[in-house]
């Protein structure tokens, strides 16, 4: 079997040296991806296309599908490559190939020709089109908007009978641009923005700020691995996980409510910039869209950018949520994003939309930056190829209950402000307050002879924190969902 890879048009308008470099990189990327399907296949580059020849017919569909997801490819032609002698021979071969497709349909013939011949492309179109029209009684020629277009390519003494055309994702080959670090949360925005930078030729590494224990990290790892495996597996990339719970705890305890959102983002950018510098990455990528939430106004984005010299790319800055969700659906991350948890109490109740630099800096003076340095130093860096095996590890399930026994205590893990606004009172059982960001250090001080029923309003944080505690060896925890 043979595939002809057509280049993304922006590649073809580059200078000769740049075009050759892009084609060489794309050829290598194709080899890296397809070697998993057929180690004997051949990838041959030409000035205006790349040929892929494979012997294992059983892998035809898998190879074709993989090619449609490699950045830099405009479209793929699945072809049958045969010799020919003259125009009548071309017609006879086209009749055998296309007869069934043309029964009862309107059609036209389009020919591309390279080499020296005693006929032109139009001559072939007329001869083959007329012959097909005569020999297939139910078919009818229609030059504009036909139901079927018969594509033929003539190159020297070879005829390419095009059996199918399949659209690629376009863009530039990965590796033609420099590396970037995507701040990935597993939601709609960060997944789409990561894809857009891969499509533009960047090798995308991932940085995840963990606010909810191992279960949340596993979910985000799965999203990152999916994106890499589907669109970027030609290159090795890093997945860096930073435990940001201590940072969030410090913010919630010391920072004024209205400034929390902007300061949290500034801390994330500081941390990600340190990671980027460590690994020689040139830019950060975020999924922020202008005005989508309070921290994404122009004033706040400028203040967030000011904490680092590292370039921050925001490919979704002018996109609305509906457009982003549609893109997530197209690339296959929608289902991941819909089930990814959102945390209760992490963001302030009345965030500022126009933060003042002096106020932000004054609030940050209360922050212990050694905490930020420590979590960055302890960041977990893994090769994304290892994630598939790691995420198959068993995640201990935590029992969810809607009632309680005599030895049970409800543990309200909401933030202090939420607890003050809506105190939890349940008749017949004790309620103890311990904000989620203190669980990792304070839960061990509680009476371990009691069973603790973790509770928050949405039930997401309570489940993830219960999973985290189970992983730490505490088996006396359940999730309370009345």
From Swiss-Prot:
Positions of disulphide bridges: 344-456
Residues annotated as catalytic: 456
Residue ranges of domain THUMP in the record: 61-165
Class of the enzyme per the UniProt entry, highest EC level: transferase
Subcellular localization: Cytoplasm
Transmembrane segments: none
Family to which the UniProt record says this protein belongs: Belongs to the ThiI family.
Name of the protein this chain belongs to: tRNA sulfurtransferase
Lineage: Bacteria, Pseudomonadati, Pseudomonadota, Gammaproteobacteria, Enterobacterales
